[in-house]
Amino acid sequence: MNAPVPVPRVADFTCEKKPATGSRGMVVTNHPLASAAGAQILLAGGNAIDAAVASLFALTVAEPMMVGILGGGLSHIRLADGRHVVIDNLSTAPGKATADMYECLSDEIGKQRDTRDRENVVGAKAVAVPGALKGWCEALARFGTLPLAEVLQPAIGLAERGFVVTPYLSNCITDNAADLARDPGLAAMLLPGGQPLQPGMRLIQSDYAASLKLIAAEGPEALYGGKLGRALTDYMAANGGLIDQADLSNYRIELREPIRGSYRGYEIIGPPPPSSSGVHIAQMLNILEGYDIGALGFGSTDAVHLLAEALKIAFADRAVATADPAFVKVPVARLIDKAYADERRALIAMEQAKSWTAGLSGGESADTTHVTVADAMGNVVSATQTINGLFGACVQTPGTGMIANNYMYNFDPHPGRALSIAPGKRVFTSMAPMMAVKEGRLAFALGLPGALRIFPSALQAIVNLIDHRMSLQEAVEAPRVWTEGGVLELEEAIPESVAQALIARGHKVVRSPRVAGGMNAIAFNPDGTLTGAACWRADGTPVAISGGLARAGARFTI
């Protein structure tokens, strides 16, 4: 990355956290105990893939509202030899799912996925076929060095011993108490005596510890054909869900080639469809490359206006063109072509907000988690995983401690569209586990939770690093903006004068206390050290590893 230099800043802010620097490894997750789990595995001789999987399992315990083995996600891996691979373990629609399985309530922007009785949000009918456990185990088997049973030990211990509830977790429970109270298992676990767990209380998950031990003994087959899978399908059958044993048996992960774009001398690498991030971050960067964004100043009216217009263009194209490539022909080459960006950029008016439609023809919820890990050998993992909404579908499979996803919400409940439901179709996602390379050397890796706000927020972090020349800590904590074509959300640190100027240009501005979730990132410095950073929007914590073994031949003598 460029060394930080003074550039104009209209939106001023102060970082609330400090970065960490190490020489032998870095683990950054959205919970300190999950970061510690990954660091423990690195110190035990594991590589970045081993550590990332250990951190993800630990997050299923410490962040039960965000991620679970009944979820799904994407892992972007850079191997020590420079190869990149994306492991797609996104959830799929059950075999019994149909395009018209929900009753739609609206076609308005921001409300297109609203359904009668929230059936695609809460309850068994909202659950898609899980891919998380199979994906993590596959990553470990292909690219890790340690056995699954060893990698699971930190999470098992955390579930058995329990951990102290943070204010962040307590707030998430409080905000979703009504939905959690509908499920006996979740109510007993998170609402003891009918009240949300409070900060400082201890959360122990004995049933879930037993499930993790079963996985340690049997591998992913414990879910995809074994006892845990039967518990899930029995619950589905009894409660109106669609997942059956055939769905679990037929589930497959996909190994995908990443999308590669370029921006001001950097190669920007991200996941391909069914994720929208790689394609549309490349598209938006191509549009922004035609402007001197850095000279406009961070948080200025012009800079925010251009971000908003680029976002609206990307969302318009995304709605008709980007989905599961097994079901929809995605025009990737066209979308990331710089000539196409030139066409779209030429239509942007600096003094007026526009309503955008797609420039070509066609053929998620805010609660996720992210892990960024690097080892001393050059392996790097940027993994975004989720059960989709806070506490997923707010159902727990009895006797297992497993919390189910509500990934069906990511589909468009209207039939006949690119994102409509079809049996076996992979869910569409905005996950953005991104990496950037300059002159053949990895510069940074980052990601965050936040549903539709994920890839726009990742875009802004990339712009912060490259155009505004922020430090890594500043880039992840900087105030954000977001729009998909309706209202323009501004975090509170964006000045009111800028908000009013944007309103004058036709933007429908609303203030938001937070756009998307806690980003975490690693920068790879020219001297070989690593810098890790996490932001104020979650419990993110970087754990750096330095030092090492004694000098060869050294002995202790008196």
Curated annotation (Swiss-Prot):
GO terms for molecular function: glutaryl-7-aminocephalosporanic-acid acylase activity; glutathione hydrolase activity; leukotriene C4 gamma-glutamyl transferase activity. The keyword Hydrolase applies. Its EC number is 3.5.1.93, 2.3.2.2, 3.4.19.13. The keyword Secreted does not apply. One of its GO terms (biological process) is response to antibiotic. Keywords: Acyltransferase, Antibiotic resistance, Hydrolase, Transferase, Zymogen. Transmembrane segments: none annotated. Pfam families: G_glu_transpept. InterPro entries: GGT_bact, GGT_CS, GGT_lsub_C, GGT_peptidase, GGT_ssub, Ntn_hydrolases_N. The active site is at T368 (nucleophile). NCBIfam families: g_glut_trans (TIGR00066). Besides the cephalosporin acylase I activity which converts GL-7ACA into 7-ACA; this enzyme displays some gamma glutamyltranspeptidase activity. Dimer of two non-identical chains processed from the same precursor. Belongs to the gamma-glutamyltransferase family. This is Acylase ACY 1 proenzyme. It comes from Pseudomonas sp. (strain V22). The gene is acyI.
